Amino acid sequence: MTDITPEASLRSLINSTTHKWIFVGGKGGVGKTTSSCSIAIQMALAQPTKQFLLISTDPAHNLSDAFNEKFGKDARKVTGMDNLSCMEIDPSAALKDVNDMAIANGGDDDGLSGLLQGGALADLTGSIPGIDEALSFMEVMKHIKKQEQGDGEHFDTVIFDTAPTGHTLRFLQLPTTLTKVLDKFGAIAGRLGPMLNSFAGNPNVDVLGKMNELKESVQKIKKQFTDPDLTTFVCVCISEFLSLYETERLIQELISYDMDVNSIIVNQLLFAESDKEHNCKRCQARWKMQKKYLSQIDELYEDFHIVKMPLCAGEIRGLENLKKFSCFLNNKYDPETDGELVYQLEQGL
């Protein structure tokens, strides 16, 4: 416990020069995409000489909707920003790419795609529960490998717009789960090597070698994910019971994974006391409820950076609106002085 109250902003993260991986997650419908876009924009504006990549790992992609432009499975620059790119992982397309790459390379690729080289393993892969998370994890592995080899565009920091909590936890469990599976599988792989190679669809594929290669990559990612200087998780919630409950569960799980988590974004706050023009009883009642849970958040997470974001009447879409809204991550929102800006966002001005 520290005697210093953490700043009610993400300024330290936005200006961080060490973080390589930033995960943004929480319960469905709490504003994860808007928050991840806002973090990515603010980091790109604060550090114009660095390159940032925003990846959506949510099967229901929203980055294209948020920026009002189409993104796909390949990283593409956000129109109007020279150092921010976006991509949306499509599980079915990614799986096809993996199989095509493995077959074309004849096994000369990363460990996981090598194991999927045609045959029965490839047929089974598409129906495996959690394949979306596995393919997202593969993108991380691919990114690390490219950075090490100097291939493709270099990104200093990758921000993940994650799926709802359950999917995200499965994704973050993958390094530990894969390590355990590979350890157990490796114990018998020596005796079953030829059989495994045949099962993979190509007797020339060294399954045991691919497994060891995969294990090394997974351990490297796990080490980075548990380094607080390299990786952090930003929780997003709204000031309601179910969201607060799920946020606490998420934080406890992250702590059990040894992942750094010290920031919470609370979205959709009414700040009704400052709305002098409209005396809305329903708004006042809801704000009273929000304040109750806000006080619990402040008490439970007194050593966290807690950022309180206002509710806008309309959706926050397009780069310019996202820029305006995201500034409240850097400078605490003041309903007395910043209310006009929120009104402009509501009107789409």
Swiss-Prot record:
EC number: 3.6.-.-
Residues the record lists as binding Zn(2+): C280, C283
Residues in coiled coil: none
Active site: D58
Record key words, sorted: ATP-binding, Cytoplasm, Endoplasmic reticulum, Golgi apparatus, Hydrolase, Metal-binding, Nucleotide-binding, Transport, Zinc
Keyword match Endoplasmic reticulum: yes
Disulfide bonds: none
Cell compartment(s), UniProt: Cytoplasm; Endoplasmic reticulum; Golgi apparatus
Recorded GO MF terms: ATP binding; ATP hydrolysis activity; guanyl-nucleotide exchange factor activity; identical protein binding; metal ion binding; protein folding chaperone; unfolded protein binding
A GO cellular-component term linked to this record: GET complex
UniProt xrefs under InterPro entries: Anion-transp_ATPase-like_dom, ATPase_ArsA/GET3, ATPase_ArsA/GET3_euk, P-loop_NTPase
GO biological process: cellular response to oxidative stress; pheromone-dependent signal transduction involved in conjugation with cellular fusion; post-translational protein targeting to endoplasmic reticulum membrane; response to heat; response to metal ion; retrograde vesicle-mediated transport, Golgi to endoplasmic reticulum; tail-anchored membrane protein insertion into ER membrane
Primary residence: cytoplasm
Family stated for the protein in its record: Belongs to the arsA ATPase family.
HAMAP family xrefs: Asna1_Get3 (MF_03112)
Functional note: ATPase required for the post-translational delivery of tail-anchored (TA) proteins to the endoplasmic reticulum. Recognizes and selectively binds the transmembrane domain of TA proteins in the cytosol. This complex then targets to the endoplasmic reticulum by membrane-bound receptors GET1 and GET2, where the tail-anchored protein is released for insertion. This process is regulated by ATP binding and hydrolysis. ATP binding drives the homodimer towards the closed dimer state, facilitating recognition of newly synthesized TA membrane proteins. ATP hydrolysis is required for insertion.
Name of the molecule in the record: ATPase GET3
Provenance organism: Eremothecium gossypii (strain ATCC 10895 / CBS 109.51 / FGSC 9923 / NRRL Y-1056) (Yeast)
